[in-house]
Amino acid sequence: MKILKLKLYQETACYKKPFATKVAETYPLPPYSTVIGMFHKILQAQPGAYFPMNISVQGNYEGIFSNYQNLRMYKGKDKVTSMPRNVHQLLNVNLIIHVQAEDETIDKIYKNIVNGTETFTLGRNEDLVRINGIKILKDVKEVEDQNIKINAYIPEWIDKEINGINYRLNTTYKIKEDIRQWDKVNVKYVEKYTNESIEEILQDEDGDNIYFYSERIPNGL
């Protein structure tokens, strides 16, 4: 299995929290399900197809602001109403994403990004992504006692005791009776420069930590 590393930039982004209606609150980083969805779009996956993968998400943003958008709501077949909604957005987002998958999957993601002509989004359809860096890692090692250098989601299986903001994030789903049943993972959102450290963690050849959401790639790979 290979690991692909991407450095992404977004001028603005809203990674909307579930069930936020009157106010569209955003996560501080994209949840795993959003990142997995982006990769499946890059892979041109057919409806219902799933490529097993493991994801690490970290990054920083310059600030947060809000604006009003018109929310359309459908009641029944014919009735449509609208209301203004406050949308929280992140400004100048820089992300580091690591994805681990079968060699063929990683090679296809890399090829489709490097040779692709389409624009990519992460979050809403209007949240465009600029890819500032992409490479398949050659050297990943386990290191000890590492500080948090970049804001990150740190899964519970890596460190239960670390201080941070608790989130229960969607990862993948199964459809039961036409309803998506999400698998979830408990994480802490930990900010840089908080004097928090992790005893053992994976680190790539550039010195960036890797916080995969699962000990093993889902589906047993």
Where are these regions (language model features)?
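Short, structured patches in soluble enzyme cores that scaffold and shape functional sites
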Residues: 8-10, 59-61, 99-101
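Internal, well-folded beta-alpha domain core
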Residues: 64-221
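N-terminal amphipathic/basic helix or basic patch
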Residues: 1, 30-34, 108
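A generic structural signal for short, non-catalytic loop/turn and secondary-structure boundary residues
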Residues: 1, 48-50, 90
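Primarily extracytoplasmic ectodomains and periplasmic/lumenal surface modules that are beta-strand-rich
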Residues: 13-15, 44-46, 105-106
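Glycine/small-residue-rich interface belts in oligomeric ring/scaffold proteins
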Residues: 18-78
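Generic beta-strand structural signal
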Residues: 4, 53-55, 93-95
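N-terminal, Lys/Arg- and Ser/Thr-rich interaction peptides
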Residues: 1-20
